[in-house]
Amino acid sequence: MEHASILARKSFWPRLLAALALLAMLIVGRYTYRDYGITVDETVERDSTLINYQYAFQTLFGRDLSLSDQPLETYKDRHYGVTLQMPTVMVEHLTGFTMPSRDIYMLRHLWTFLLCLSGLACFYLFLERVLSNRWYALLGLLMLALYPRFWGEQFTNIKDMVFMAACCWALLATALSLRHEGKWRWEILSALLFALCANTRVIGFLFPSLLFGYRVLRDGVLTPVWKKGGARRFFAQLAKHALALLLMLVCYVLVTPAAWASPLTFLIETFQEFSNYNIWNGTVYFLGDWYSGNALPWYYLPVWLCLSIPLWYLAFMLAGAAGAAAFVLRSRRRLGSALRRVLLGPGRWFVLCLIVAVLPVAAAILMHSTLYNGWRHMYFIFPELVVVALFGVQWLFRLLRGRRWPRRILAGGLAALLAGQACWIGWMHPFEKFYLNPVGQSMCDLLEKDYWYESTTAQILHILEVDDSRRICLSVNAFSSIPAFNYLAAKDARRVYIYDSYTYTDWTPIDYIIDESCGPVSSTFPGFTPVYELRCANGMLLSTIYMRDEALAERFGGQWPQQ
């Protein structure tokens, strides 16, 4: 059983400010969610959701629903859970699947944002339960919410960002399970949250597994129950913990339609597929070179983390690690009892978050795992890294105990840094997801940027605004233009024609090529002239419009209109 709350200061103000911050984010998100373009994976994710929804509806209600010709049983992506995306298709169903394409994807943007906002709320509640006072919890909430890459991606990235939010749910579920141990209504709630997390990404099984392992370690070693109650009591406790784990597996099957027909077989297939994932054979641009996704250098993830996380976050993460190292050095003569004290007290949350943050990265490096663009597939470790940083902040404040002005300067500096990030987000909107820290910004041309091809939407809208021709003929250019179709109003979509070619012929009369900066920015296309560059507010190049020379001369006299 967990002891009484460790909150030393129960000030009302941090909780009020946290509620106001979440409300402000909700208002801002409500009025900006339509500002973001449509990315390449959004259409794929919707297709997966339709296939799962069709199967679930037919299985539960015995009625046909013709949404896709692809049966779920043989669908290649059936092991990717989409339960948290189902409500968007339910809304489509209520309208008879007659919603305009743009409204469908804007609904998904809003829903993704709301899921991420719920993750932020759960993260704050988790921090309240594991840190020494609520001011640290408020700081953690703002550090996570105002991380620029996350703010921009929480509308369009319905996979990685939703999984990040689900991991925040899982952190809270872990805290609730330990605080209310033995109360099955809390175990059921935690099992459901764990199941939704694992449904979103199979690595979500890490949280209930760590919880089970901790309970066994606690009852068997740290506070051995068999010393007082004998082996029978220990095995009774072990059975109870195993039952909680089994409850989570049952919930996972219930929320995963693809597992309904054969749960055990599906679980085995899922673990086999993702233990050696090598389906994706794309290429990644990293530090000026192209690599296959399954042959990246070992330092790929560490470098991306160091270039795209604010430097002051990294500094406090190092402070947290330094504080832990200092504790180990101080306790080296009585390390066993010190570790026991840590694992039974607030320090266990530092250990948990450190494991969740380090283990997946270490596994990816050691197993040479296939990795996608950037580090988006590891976004779920960021809340845990924030917790490590918060322990660093807490350690520094303890070092400054009794020194009023240094503590005030540190607190004021943190507030100023967070305010600066909020201003940066507003300045870069709607391209805040391309954030790099000053070191990363200095070498941005050596890294992938718009690998989601989101800027294509803005570029097509710009072409439609400038060129009033009846037909706007585009090159497909790595399929990036097709998702943008779903953003266009019907009258605009009727003007746009897309061809799978980079060359003008009678059969492929393309006038425009949109080149996204997913690699070197020196792309050239014979017979086409670069006419417009889309850049972020900080000057980072996102994409370039190329126009066929003859069309440029005919429509604009050889000079693209400057606005």
Regions found by a protein language model. Give the residues of each.
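Transmembrane-lumen/periplasm boundary regions of multi-pass, lipid-linked membrane glycan transferases
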Residues: 53-58, 77-86, 95-97, 196, ...
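Short acidic/glycine- and proline-prone juxtamembrane loop motifs at membrane-interface regions
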Residues: 39, 152-162
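Membrane-interface transmembrane helices that cradle and orient dolichyl/undecaprenyl
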Residues: 129-131, 170-187, 197, 221
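Loop-to-helix entry region of an early transmembrane alpha helix in multi-pass inner-membrane enzymes
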Residues: 78, 82, 86, 97-121, ...
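Catalytic lumenal/periplasmic loop and adjoining terminal transmembrane helix
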Residues: 29-36, 84, 257-260, 265-274, ...
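Short helix- or helix-capping micro-motifs
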Residues: 140-145, 194, 198, 211
